[in-house]
Amino acid sequence: VLTDEDKARVRASWVPVGKNAELYGSETLTRMFAAHPTTKTYFPHFDLSPGSNNLRAHGKKVIDAITEAVNNLDDVAGTLSKLSDLHAQKLRVDPVNFKLLAHCLLVTIAAHNGGVLKPEVIVSLDKFLGDLSKDLVSKYR
């Protein structure tokens, strides 16, 4: 459960991510595909080369969806309900992939903001991304 302090840290640290959704999203997907090649199976129709139009467009969608969650921290599950349905019912994405994506996103954020991110901010972001992953798999039951 995110505390009020966690929520404030997440909102503040998310500003550069939300403003650069395509960059952060594309880098996160590139990192995930490199570190976890099995995740590529969900994107057979994509050009998965770093910086491709497909990765930039889908990466932006991912970050934009997470930005909506950041803007609605008191109802992340409700905010992501349709997205959870899509991934569970239609796309049938293995739930573990949300954790992999969350980890790669945290690494991407740290890579861009290394000196600025304090341990407590990293902890708050990690808690948020963990909760986000749980909310996305809620429709798998």
Curated annotation (Swiss-Prot):
GO terms for molecular function: haptoglobin binding; heme binding; iron ion binding; organic acid binding; oxygen binding; oxygen carrier activity; peroxidase activity. One of its GO terms (biological process) is hydrogen peroxide catabolic process. Pfam families: Globin. Keywords: Heme, Iron, Metal-binding, Oxygen transport, Transport. Heterotetramer of two alpha chains and two beta chains. Heme b binds at residue 87. O2 binds at residue 58. It comes from the Eukaryota. Residues 1-141 form the Globin domain. Involved in oxygen transport from the lung to the various peripheral tissues. Red blood cells. The keyword Transcription does not apply. This is Hemoglobin subunit alpha-1. GO terms for cellular component: blood microparticle; haptoglobin-hemoglobin complex; hemoglobin complex. Belongs to the globin family. CDD domains: Hb-alpha-like (cd08927).
